[in-house]
Regions:
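Catalytic strand-loop segment that frames the active site of acyl-thioester-processing enzymes
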Residues: 2-37, 54
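Small beta-barrel nucleic-acid-binding modules, principally OB-folds
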Residues: 57-73
C-alpha cells in the first residue's frame, strides 16, 4: 500500500450511477485499525444490488462475486461513494461493476479509488428458483 500522501487522486465517474454513500465508524475496524474488508464487501454487495433491483422488479440474490480488489485501505471517517453500472444482462442474471471512492476526512474534495468489484445477481421467484428478468428499456432503469 502507498503512504497517504502518495495516494493517487482521481475524479469521480460521470458514466455510472451513484448508488450509496456511507461513512465507516470505529466499530467497523479490523485489528490493524483500518476498516474491516468484510464490512467493505457487505457495503459493495448492497450497493451492487441497487441497479439490478431496477431490472429484476422483484426478489433477487447475489450469486457470484466475480472479482473483488482492495486498492487502498479505508479509514474511519472516510466518506465512501459507491458507483455502479451494468456489465451484462442475461436471461435470469445481471452482472454489475462497482467502484468505491474515498474522500479522506482530512482531505475533503479529493478522491481516491479504494475498491472495485464485479458481482452477479440472479432474479428469483418466491421459491428461490431463477426466473426471467423482465424486458425493459435500459434508459427506464436509471
Amino acid at each position: 500500500m502507498t503512504a497517504p500522501t502518495d495516494e493517487p487522486r482521481v475524479q469521480l465517474p460521470t458514466d455510472q450511477d451513484l448508488v450509496l454513500k456511507v461513512i465507516p465508524m470505529p466499530g467497523d475496524c479490523n485489528a490493524n485499525g483500518d476498516i474491516f474488508g468484510g464490512w467493505v464487501m457487505a457495503q459493495v454487495d448492497l450497493a451492487g444490488s441497487v441497479v439490478p433491483a431496477r431490472y429484476t422488479q422483484g426478489r433477487m440474490a447475489t450469486v457470484a462475486v466475480n472479482e473483488f480488489v482492495f486498492k487502498q485501505p479505508v479509514r474511519v471517517g472516510d466518506i465512501l461513494s459507491f458507483f455502479s453500472t451494468v456489465s451484462r444482462i442475461g436471461r435470469t442474471s445481471i452482472t454489475v461493476k462497482v467502484e468505491v471512492y474515498a474522500e479522506r476526512f482530512s482531505r475533503q474534495g479529493q478522491y481516491i479509488k479504494v475498491t472495485e468489484a464485479s458481482l452477479t445477481y440472479v432474479a428469483i421467484d418466491d421459491n428461490g428458483k431463477p426466473r426471467e428478468i423482465p424486458k425493459m428499456d435500459p434508459a427506464a432503469a436509471i
